[in-house]
Curated annotation (Swiss-Prot):
ATP binds at residues 22, 64-69, 280, 345, 417. Residues 178-192 have a biased composition (Basic and acidic residues). This is ATP-dependent protease ATPase subunit HslU. One of its GO terms (biological process) is proteolysis involved in protein catabolic process. The keyword Cytoplasm applies. The gene is hslU. Pfam families: AAA, AAA_2, ClpB_D2-small. Belongs to the ClpX chaperone family. HslU subfamily. PANTHER family: ATP-DEPENDENT CLP PROTEASE ATP-BINDING SUBUNIT CLPX-LIKE, MITOCHONDRIAL-RELATED, ATP-DEPENDENT PROTEASE ATPASE SUBUNIT HSLU. A double ring-shaped homohexamer of HslV is capped on each side by a ring-shaped HslU homohexamer. The assembly of the HslU/HslV complex is dependent on binding of ATP. ATPase subunit of a proteasome-like degradation complex; this subunit has chaperone activity. The binding of ATP and its subsequent hydrolysis by HslU are essential for unfolding of protein substrates subsequently hydrolyzed by HslV. HslU recognizes the N-terminal part of its protein substrates and unfolds these before they are guided to HslV for hydrolysis. InterPro entries: AAA+_ATPase, ATP-dep_Clp_protease_ClpX, ATPase_AAA_core, Clp_ATPase_C, HslU, P-loop_NTPase. Residues 149-192 are annotated as: Disordered.
Length: 467
């Protein structure tokens, strides 16, 4: 697995995070240090490695300020497997619902996909060449071989040929004739020139097995995986365009070209050494004295999470995985509860605390303009596909930021997510009419913003429903 990302310095990691996330420098610094410590640990001898475990992080801040995005972008920067889970979705062991070990199994699934995607990219050219060869044969097929005439299984008792019931002659073909060879050469040339991309071709693909609906969520998933491994893969015929068929066939050939067992072992190691599990809404399982009935269940979930944070060996369909060196990031608003409401053992497993700042008007302005593909740039690009040019003035952007901030103050504070609703509502009419406005140029001014939003933003009841 490519580990170039893990060698980035904390400054380089923060710089990359700054391309997508505005502010929250303290949080960025702490996650960057946590990542760098992983690289430092990888350089130590085996004995020292076993003694050093990651320092888990607890992010505290309201929704929409960047907690999840910082963790997700960080994982992407270093190429680490990342999974986000919600603490409220888990139940105590013995109850119907997802048990806490499922987060580790989900992380391993992500790790396997990462490793296999990279290994497939290394054999992509060979797999595509095989796919093109198969496409030529599908577009110009040979004659099918005739089925064996030995249909009576008792015939072998009287000296006849022994039938091979396991052999499937359905796809076997006669050697191609000279005429077929000539046609295939022509088709191959046309494929290479891209002239047949929209032509239809029939291919066989593996049928997606149905789900079992008789068990609880977690038991259902494990039973389904076992059944899928035991049962033979069933294939169905589909008619698709050549360009789609090439992707399906190339992916299938790439699977055959890579060593699956080696990839699975590499994925398990990657999950163990580089895995990041983001546990959102951890404040919702914190206990307080207001509702003693629910506190028992919440404490049960916390106590189930604790062994995984301390280091447990979890069984997955790819093999066992140890959670001791995974990085866990807990996150929550902690409006009702406090970090000290978590059970003491769990508090001790999150030694690094970082409080994220609420967003001000200036932050909203920066979010709209600074990131690599900011919201403003996204909407400009979308409307440009309809040949409509949209220009946002600086004053209009400031006005949008002011409205977003005010609506957050007057209703629920959902942070930067408010900008999505504000922009979507403001550009609703333009997005609807854009196909009938080719080559139009639209200037978004403060007046335009107020015309579209002022009546809503000044009415608290309407704001709560619409924005």
């Amino acid at each position: 697995m490519d580990t170039a990302g893990i060698r980035l310095t904390p400054k380089e990691i923060v710089s990359k995070l700054n391309e997508y996330i505005v502010g929250q420098n303290d949080a960025k610094r702490k996650v960057a240090i946590a990542l760098r410590n992983r690289y430092r640990r990888s350089l130590l001898d085996e004995e020292s490695k076993q003694e050093i475990s990651p320092k888990n992080i607890l992010m505290i801040g309201p929704t929409g300020v960047g907690k999840t995005e910082i963790a997700r972008r960080m994982a992407k920067v270093v190429g680490a497997p990342f999974i986000k889970v919600e603490a409220t979705k888990f139940t105590e062991v013995g109850y119907v619902g997802r048990d806490v070990e499922s987060m580790v199994r989900d992380l391993v699934d992500v790790s396997v996909r990462l490793v296999k995607a990279q290994k497939k990219s290394l054999v992509q050219d060979e797999a595509t060449a095989k796919a093109n060869e198969k496409l030529v044969k599908l577009l110009v097929p040979s004659m099918k071989k005739k089925a064996s005439q030995t249909n009576n299984p008792l015939e072998s008792l009287f000296g006849g040929a022994i039938p091979n019931f396991g052999q499937n002659n359905e796809d076997e073909e006669e050697p191609p004739t000279e005429e077929i060879k000539t046609k295939r050469s022509e088709i191959k040339r046309q494929l290479e020139e891209g002239k047949l991309e929209k032509e239809k071709v029939r291919i066989k693909v593996e049928q997606d097995p149905g789900a079992l609906g008789m068990l609880g969520t977690n038991q259902n998933q494990q039973m389904q995986e076992m059944m899928n491994q035991l049962m033979p893969k069933k294939k169905v015929e589909r008619e698709v365009a050549v360009e789609t068929a090439r992707k399906i066939l190339a992916d299938s050939y790439a699977d055959e070209l890579i060593d699956q067992e080696s990839a699975n072992q590499e994925a398990l190691e990657l999950a163990e050494q580089m895995g990041i599990i983001f546990i959102d809404e951890i404040d919702k399982v914190a206990t307080n004295n207001h509702n003693s009935g629910q506190d028992v269940s919440r404490q049960g979930v916390q106590r189930d999470i604790l062994p995984i944070l301390e280091g447990s060996v979890i069984q997955t369909k790819y093999g066992t995985v140890n959670t001791e060196h995974m990085l866990f990031i807990g996150a929550g608003a902690f409006h009702v509860s406090k970090p000290s409401d978590l059970i003491p053992e769990l508090q001790g497993r999150f030694p690094i605390r970082v409080e994220l700042d609420s967003l001000a008007v200036e932050d909203f302005v920066r979010i709209l303009t600074e990131p690599k593909l900011s919201l403003i740039k996204q909407y400009e690009a979308l409307l440009q596909t309809e040949e409509v040019t949209v220009n946002f003035t600086d004053e209009a952007i400031t006005r949008l930021a002011e409205i977003a901030y005010q609506v957050n103050q007057d209703t629920d504070n959902i942070g930067a997510r408010r900008l999505h609703t504000i922009l979507e509502k403001m550009l609703e009419d333009l997005s609807f009419e854009a196909p009938s406005m080719p080559n139009a140029v639209v200037d978004i001014t403060p007046q335009y913003v107020d015309d579209k939003l002022k009546s809503i933003s000044t009415n608290k009841d309407l704001s709560a429903f619409i924005l």
